[in-house]
């Protein structure tokens, strides 16, 4: 886990509840839920869980921020579709398909709304050339066990990373700065704004970590 601080979170556009600065969050435990609008798992599990945490711990000092990002499907994971979801409950693409399949939409819309601040990660054009050094750096950032792999396994990973970078036209600043593995991801900061946890997928230990941070003095 890196040594980034709360101030390293980049929000390009606030869609709901912002702008919020790191100074305004001083003394609070901050949980940043990183998602994509075209990410079924984000809407099936992570965001509903975040709503529960917000309702349970808001008065005890927990602040949750929803941060939409885009590391793929750039035509779907857009600011416009984020605004649509937040303002009307409309979802798109694979998210719509999955939630429809599980009967989790009402009249084609979300049955819930996010009760906390929501913003969009800064997504910019990828201009850095794909060099061997960049491929290796990515491999080590996104796969911490890379150096422990066999030579054959390392070459397979490098090949996959190189192919990914070759077709990657955009980069999301917060997503890459914190070396997130995908969405949903959770980034937890303590009351001092120091990074306490970065997790990918469903996080079973999340509530206990939040409680530990809330119990600590600022």
Role assignments for model-derived ranges:
Residues 1-23, 155-163:
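N-terminal "domain-start" segment that seeds a small globular fold
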Residues 7, 29-30, 183-185:
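Short loop/turn microsegments at loop-to-beta-strand junctions
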Residues 45-138:
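Structural microenvironment flanking redox-active thiols in thiol-disulfide oxidoreductases
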Residues 20-46, 50, 63-67:
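Short active-site neighborhood of thiol/selenol oxidoreductases, capturing the structured segment around
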Residues 4, 60, 114, 178-181:
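Structured loop/turn residues at beta-strand edges in well-structured enzyme cores
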